[in-house]
Amino acid sequence: VDFASESXNKRENQQIVDKHNAL
């Protein structure tokens, strides 16, 4: 498992969730 890409994916997913919550 590449922890660097894992954390990047988590950050991207969190940004997506934040966008949906902002709507």
UniProtKB/Swiss-Prot annotation:
Residues 8-23 have a biased composition (Basic and acidic residues). Expressed by the venom gland. Residues 1-23 are annotated as: Disordered. Belongs to the CRISP family. One of its GO terms (cellular component) is extracellular region. The keyword Disulfide bond applies. This is Cysteine-rich venom protein 24. Keywords: Disulfide bond, Secreted, Toxin. Not toxic when administered to cockroaches at doses up to 5 nmol/g. The lineage of its organism: Eukaryota, Metazoa, Chordata, Craniata, Vertebrata.
